[in-house]
Amino acid sequence: YRFNVGGGYEKDNLRIENPWRYVESFMNKDGTFDYSKDKYAVKMMKKCLKLGNIDTLIFFANSPHFTQTVTGQTSGGFTEHFSNLDKSKYEDFAKYLIDIAEHFIKEGYPVKYISPINEPQWKWGGESVWQEGCHYEPKEVYDCFLEFAKELEKRKSSLKLYGPESGNIKDHTKEYYKLLSSNELIMKYLDTFAYHSYGSDENVGEKVEFGKWAKKNIKTPRFDMSEWCELPCKHDTKSVESSLIMARIIGEDLIYTGVDSWSAWVCVNQWDNYSDGFLVAKDD
């Protein structure tokens, strides 16, 4: 179960218009914590855990906390392809996300992984923003994971790192792994190398090639495909056409890329038509 740790916001410094796309943070602006925040997401997580078939929680962040960003926002920089994580805040970001995960562990939640980065290659920012996100260049991905590994080592934590959840199998995905795997401390805590299977729905050859590379090179205990939906959503998720497409993609990713697990995006959203959500929830 992937749980999104929101980066928070200030109403007078917020460019994301859709309230479904900005998320309360458990950390206040002054650095104190309030775990009554984002209560409905926590409530949904609790309900799912009560079903008894979930043994692993992955806490992932689309953005650092808004106080740790250059813009004071979680929707990316004011220019495209610019990392919004303040260079002086890498350690703060690691402490913040690990603190939250450890709080839930103490409360009895089976948090096994933290994923600090989501789809680092995308532009995340500029004039048009729509959700939380943060761009990272490959070296910045490395620097971020190293800071998290250092903090986990300092705490002798049982938590493991997950990621970097590249947006596809192309672009910098292989470079991310090459950089991360070059550091012994990172690899001590990077239990799962994860990517998203976007952009190759009609190109099995790309998946075959990537799978061969992964089998030869990836040495982490797990290798996951952590997010996919049909993009663009030409079929509603309630339709048989959508089901057949998803079944094909699941099969291709398991067989050709050799992943250990496969996750869909997303369980619930607000749209009825051509939705990527399995369930629809309305504001009322």
Q: Language-model features: where?
A:
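A general structural signal for short secondary-structure junctions and capping/turn motifs
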Residues: 47-51, 214-216, 251-256
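N-terminal catalytic cores of secreted or lumenal carbohydrate-active enzymes
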Residues: 1-112, 116, 132-137, 142, ...
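Aromatic/acidic polysaccharide-binding cleft in carbohydrate-active enzymes
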Residues: 222-284
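Noncatalytic linker/hinge segments flanking ATPase motor cores
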Residues: 45-48, 100-103, 204-208, 235, ...
